[in-house]
């Protein structure tokens, strides 16, 4: 299957599964952070959209442990940057219908929680097709160490994803099962 076919198949399954309660294990994510010995406590995340893994409880847990949360915002040049946000802060909806932070405090996160449509055993991912996360990870890795953690349902795992030179491999994938 090509990426477009995989997206179509997974979107359908993800929509059907959306009524079920899937919870991420925040302790597993914290164990990754300890293992990697990340110095800063700045986490780039995403606001759940289009039946993605719900990150809101995870953000609340991380804030209790003094992590700072950042969410992406897309600018007019189709570039993604991350801005501070707290679970108590309001959001604004962009032209794609995605909630974004209002803050103008931009920073590079140390850890990036990445939404995805599908992933494989080699930690390749398929996103929505805009290349936002691939470009962002590529840009940041030149400047500093960043750990990318894909968040997914276990049913989003596929056998093999054909990649191109612009696709950035994740460091980890966390599902509701592990």
Predicted feature locations:
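Residues at the C-termini of beta-strands that transition into short coil/loop
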Residues: 73, 86, 102, 152, ...
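Short, well-ordered alpha-helical microsegments
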Residues: 52-55, 133, 158
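Glycine-rich, N-terminal phosphate-binding loop of Rossmann-like dinucleotide-binding domains
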Residues: 47, 116, 177
